Amino acid sequence: MESPVPIAGKMADKLQLIVTNLHWRYSGVTATNRMVAPKLADMFDAAWLGSDAPAGIARMDIGDLMKLWLRRKPVIWHARRNNEMIAGVLLKALGWPLKLLFTSAAQRHHTWITRWLISRMDAIIATSDISASYLKRSATVVTHGVDTDRYAPPVDRAAAFAEAKLPGRYAIGCFGRVRAQKGTDLFVDAMCELLPRYPDFTAVIVGAITPDQIGFANELKRKIADAGLQSRIVITGELPIDEVERWYRRLTIYAFTSRSEGFGLTLIEAMSAGAALVATRAGAAEIVIEEGVTGNLVPTGDAAALTLALEPLMRDPDAATAMGAYARQRVLDRFSLDAEARGIAEVYRRLL
């Protein structure tokens, strides 16, 4: 059920924060935004503007936004995309009392338009020191967090796996949109080599196949069929978030295979659920993973290295389970949603 539209009566005067999500497609940015927004709404008078509003935060629409014009008391406009920064800059120029904040996850040099937009912000958050290093101004580093209650290990992982009615005893997964940037092809290549040697494992790919990636996905399916592994490499397509959480709980091993990434939320989601990790050196992997303790790192784009790193865990599921327990503790200690919310809240308070 959607939260009610909030801007009525005194709410327009009390509003402190607008969380923007001006994007039609559900993405990793949307996921991180949705997770932390209700926590922030517990600390500030907040409203969500845009699609995919989560429970726990009031919603607003364009009509509600119009009611804030020429209000004296400032309101934080928290943007995570270029179009949201553009909207904030324009509204502020036209008289809306906005304090502009941008969260940057990109680990690359920004385009000129993004650099200009960033220069117009009142404050910047970077999701890692690496992301901060690409900015031309100071930023507060606040790493992403995950809801460790929702992404929790199952009481009985064997029973959780059995619910899926898949062959074998263990699951190894790779989650995210099916495309080359996410390295789905690397995972398929590794599984085509490893699964024949480890019959107790089934591989699961969870993520959307967008229209522009149908050809890419069909080529993966051809490889899987040629290897005779149609029943042991399962591509689910896009799933509701509660189904995705259920799949995390079934995993013994998680492969993070991105060639490039901003942060890579699936890293900490899988760790929180107690999966052992093998990850490419993309996004926040080098920050999140303790090499040899909570996971292992491999170069990006290297299917052979990925295969080599995954095999010892598939050979010894008990060792993978122990590594997953350390991974879970690492998230509890360093990457909880509460810690992220506290870090963002400190920036908000400076702006207000």
Locations of the language-model features?
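Donor nucleotide-sugar binding/catalytic pocket of nucleotide-sugar-dependent glycosyltransferases
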Residues: 118-157, 166-167, 174
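Conserved donor-binding/catalytic core segment of Leloir-type glycosyltransferases
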Residues: 163-182, 188-193, 204
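Nucleotide-activated donor-binding/catalytic signature segment of Leloir-type glycosyltransferases, i.e.
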Residues: 217-238
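Short alpha-helical donor nucleotide-sugar binding micro-motif in glycosyltransferases
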Residues: 238-239, 246-251
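Aromatic "clamp/platform" in nucleotide-sugar-dependent glycosyltransferases that forms part
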Residues: 259
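Short hydrophobic beta-strand element within catalytic cores of glycosyltransferases
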Residues: 276-280, 289
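Conserved acidic donor-binding segment of nucleotide-sugar-dependent glycosyltransferases
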Residues: 291-292, 296-304, 312-318
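A short, well-ordered alpha-helix in the C-terminal region of glycosyltransferases
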Residues: 312, 319-334, 340-343
